[in-house]
Amino acid sequence: MSDISQQMNNLSVQDNNKPNGNGYSGQPQQQSGRRQYVPPHLRNRSSHQPSSNGANGDIPFGGSRRSDYGGGRGGFGFGGGSNGGGSGPSGGYRNGGARGGSRGGFGGGRYQRPTPGVGRWVDGKHEPAPRNDRLELELFGVAEDTLFQSSGINFDNYDDIPVEASGEGVPEPINSFTAPPLDELLVENIKLSRFTKPTPVQKYSVPIVAAGRDLMACAQTGSGKTGGFLFPVLSESYMNGPAPIPESTGAFSSHKVYPTILVMAPTRELVSQIYDESKKFAYRSWVRPCVVYGGADIGNQIRQLDRGCDLLVATPGRLKDLLERGRVSLANIKYLVLDEADRMLDMGFEPQIRHIVQECDMPDVQDRQTLMFSATFPRDIQMLARDFLKDYIFLSVGRVGSTSENITQKVLYVEDEEKKSVILDLLNANSEGLTIVFTETKRMADNLADFLYDQGFPATAIHGDRSQYEREKALAAFKSGQAPILVATAVAARGLDIPNVSHVINYDLPSDIDDYVHRIGRTGRAGNVGIATAFFNRNNKNIVKGMLDLLTEANQEVPDFLNKIARESAFGRPGRGSSRGGGAGGFGGSRGGANRDFRRAGGASGSSSSGWGNSSSSGWGGSGNSGWGNSNGYSNGGGSYGGSRSSFNDNSSYGNPSSQNSWW
C-alpha cells in the first residue's frame, strides 16, 4: 500500500502527458501499439490468447465500435451466454433427476441419459454423481487461477470483526467447514472452490438455518453473503431431499417446475452471479440450478426450466411473468432467499415481491424458511420483515453500512469541467489491475468510455440501455482483462463480485451515501485491498456529512475541503446527511440504525442486548401492518418510492421497474 500511497501523493491534475509503465499517456495513441493488460491469472501462461468469440486485439472499444467488443463465455456462460439467459445446457445441469420417486428421468417416464455432474435422490437417499474433470475445470479453475479466487491476503482480518446476533436461542457459530454440520458433498465443493474458512456471516448462517430459524443478515459488502445463504440451504437440501409433487398437479407434469429453493435479487447481473456460484456448490448433487431474468428470450428460459429446476434464481419481474404463464409453481418452496432486499424495495419491486410471496402458491411463512440478506437494513426494511419472516434471528456483522478498512479512500476536489483531465492522470498513475468508473447517467457512461478509448485506454461500458448480449460481452471482456476499464452506471454497483478490481473511481458521486458505500465495495472484497477515488465538488454537498462519517469510521484521511463544506452546509442546510433515517446518528449512530434490530424495546434503539422491550412477535413498537409504507424515510414514497426518488429512475440504468417491458 505504500507504493499506492506514493503514487496518489504524486498525482498531478495538470500533467496530462505523463507516460506510465504500460505506455499509456494522456495523448491519443494508436491502438495497435498498446500493450494489452494481462490479468494475474493469465500472466504465467506462455501466451495470452483472447477469446475466440469476437474479442481480440483488433476489435475496438469505443462507442458503436465497443458494441462489437468482447466475446460470449463458453461452457458455463454468464447468465447462460448464448442461450439467452437460461441455465445453459453446456454446464451439465440439463435433466439430472426427475420429479418422480427416484428422480431418474424428467417428465412422462421418458428415459434420459444421466447428465454429467448431476446426482440423484433415490429411495430417500442422496446419490452424488461421479466426479468430472472437465466440469471441475470449468467450475473451479486451477489453484493459481485468481479469476476463481475466494480469499485475499487480509482474509484473517475478518476474525476481528464484531458480530451481534439478536433473538431467542441463537445457535453457536461454526468455526470451520466440516461435516457435520454441513453435508459432506457440500464440504467437498467448498474445498474445490478454495474457501478455507467461513466468514462471520457464514459462521452464523449455517447453524441458524440448520436449526430451522429464519434469518435477517446485515453484513459488509464483500463479506460472503452469497455463501451465507447458499451453504446452509444447499446443505439442508442435500440431507433432506426434494418434496413430492403436489397430487393435484399430476406427478409427471412436464410443463411446470417445482423448485425447492427460490432466490430473488434485483438485477440480472446479480442473479447471474448467484447462479454461477450455485453451480459450483450444487456440483454432483441432485439440485439443479436455473436462472431467469428480463431482457433475455423467455422462450429459451422456459426450455431450460423444462429440463429441471430445483434452485431458482430470479428477478421479481421475470418470475412473476413465468408464474402467470403457469411454468413455475412455488408450492414446494422450502427456502426463500431475498438478496439485496433493501435495493429491491428502493427500485419499486415491493408489489411484485408481495404478490410472489403472499398471493401465489408459496407455502405460508410458518411452513418455509426465509432468509433476507443485504449490506444495509434501514428501519423500513426491517419492518417489512414482520410479513415475510417468523421468529427470526437478526445478524449484524461489523460496522454495517460503513466501508472496509481494506479500501483506501481518496476524495479529490474536482470541478465538472476538469474531471476528464483528472481521470486520465489517475489511470496513468494506477494502470495495473481492473478499474471500475461509475457515472450517474447512461449518456455519460457511453461518452466517457468513448473518450477513454480515444485517449488510448481500453474501456468498455455497461448500463440499462445495453442489450443483454452487449452487457455479457462487456463484463466478460472486463473480467478477462481485455478491457481493464469498465464505465458503469448503478446497474453494476451492487452485488457483482469481480476478482482483481483494484480501483473504483466515482466520476459522478451518487445522491445517496449508501449508494456510495455499495459502489466502492466493488474493490477490497473478501479481504483484498483496493483504492476508491471520488471526484467531489459543491454539487455533492448533500452527502458531505455522510462521507465525513464514513471516512472517519474507516480510519481514512479526511481532506480539509470536506470539513469546510460540511461546516458551510451545517449553517445553510441543517440536517441533510444521508437520505435514510434522518442522516448519520439517527438510531444507534449508524445512519438510521441500519444495523440495529428494531424489535428491541418496541422499535427504539439503544436498548440492551437482552429482552425484547414491549414489542410482540408481530408488532413493531405499535406500528400497524399497513403503516410502514408511509412511515419510512422516503416521504411520498409509499410502496413504489416514486415521489421522492424520481431522480433515481431518471439517472440510473434500471429504467422503469413497474413496466412489463423492463429488463427484470
Curated annotation (Swiss-Prot):
Q: Where is this motif: Q motif?
A: 175-203
**InterPro entries (alphabetical):** DEAD/DEAH_box_helicase_dom, Helicase_ATP-bd, Helicase_C-like, P-loop_NTPase, RNA-helicase_DEAD-box_CS, RNA_helicase_DEAD_Q_motif
Q: Where is the composition biased (Polar residues)?
A: 1-18, 648-664
Which spans does this entry mark as compositional bias, Low complexity?
A: 19-37, 606-618
State the UniProt keywords alphabetically.
ATP-binding, Cytoplasm, Helicase, Hydrolase, Initiation factor, Nucleotide-binding, Protein biosynthesis, RNA-binding
Q: What class of enzyme is it?
A: hydrolase
Gene Ontology terms: cellular component: cytoplasmic stress granule; spliceosomal complex
| Motif window: DEAD box | 339-342
Q: Where is this region: Disordered?
A: 1-129, 569-664
Ranges for the Helicase ATP-binding domain?
Answer: 206-395
Q: Where is the Helicase C-terminal domain?
A: 406-566
Where would you say this protein principally sits, based on its record?
Answer: cytoplasm
Q: Record's family?
A: Belongs to the DEAD box helicase family. DDX3/DED1 subfamily.
About its domains, the entry says: The Q motif is unique to and characteristic of the DEAD box family of RNA helicases and controls ATP binding and hydrolysis.
Task: Quote the protein name from its UniProt record.
Answer: ATP-dependent RNA helicase DED1
